[in-house]
C-alpha cells in the first residue's frame, strides 16, 4: 500500500500541489490526470525517492519513505519518466529496461516475464 498524507510540493516559491492525501492498495489501478505542471509526475517521482515532499509524508507498506527506506523501495520498484530519452524500438524493450538496472536480476528478463507485465498492464505485445 502507498499512502500520501498531506503532501505539498513547492516549486519556485509557489505550491505545485497542496495537501494531497490518498491511499493506493496493492494491485489497485490509479489514474492521475490534470493540467500540465500541477505535480502528477512529481508525485510519482516522490515514490521512487527522486524528490521528497516539502510537507507531508509518504508511507509504503506502513514504512515512512526516508533516505533509508528509499534504498529498499528502489530494489522492488521501477519508474520510467514521461520524458524518456533512451532509444527503445519497442514497448517490450521499454518494459524490459528496469530489469536490467536492478541488483540481483538477470541482465535480460525472460520473454515470459515481459508478457506477464504486458498482461498486468492490460497491453498486447506487438
Region locations from a protein language model:
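Conserved ABC ATPase "signature" region
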Residues: 108-126
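The feature captures the beta-strand-to-loop junction immediately N-terminal to the Walker
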Residues: 33-35
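ABC nucleotide-binding domain signature
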Residues: 31, 71-89
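Conserved beta-strand
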Residues: 4-7, 14-25, 56
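Q-loop/switch helix immediately C-terminal to the Walker
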Residues: 83, 89-105, 113
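Conserved Walker
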Residues: 41-42
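Helix-to-loop junction immediately C-terminal to a conserved catalytic motif
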Residues: 48
Amino acid at each position: 500500500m502507498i499512502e500520501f498524507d498531506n503532501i505539498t510540493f513547492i516549486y519556485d516559491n509557489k505550491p505545485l500541489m497542496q495537501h494531497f492525501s490518498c491511499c493506493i492498495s496493492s494491485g489497485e489501478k490509479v489514474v492521475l490526470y490534470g493540467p500540465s505542471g500541477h505535480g502528477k509526475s512529481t508525485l510519482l517521482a516522490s515514490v521512487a525517492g527522486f524528490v521528497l515532499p516539502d510537507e507531508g509524508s509518504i508511507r509504503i507498506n506502513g514504512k515512512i519513505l526516508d533516505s533509508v527506506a528509499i534504498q529498499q523501495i528502489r530494489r522492488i520498484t521501477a519508474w520510467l519518466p514521461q520524458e524518456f530519452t533512451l532509444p527503445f524500438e519497442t514497448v517490450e524493450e521499454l518494459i524490459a529496461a528496469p530489469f536490467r538496472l536492478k541488483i540481483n536480476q538477470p541482465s535480460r528478463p525472460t520473454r515470459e516475464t515481459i508478457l506477464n507485465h504486458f498482461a498486468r498492464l492490460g497491453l498486447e505485445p506487438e
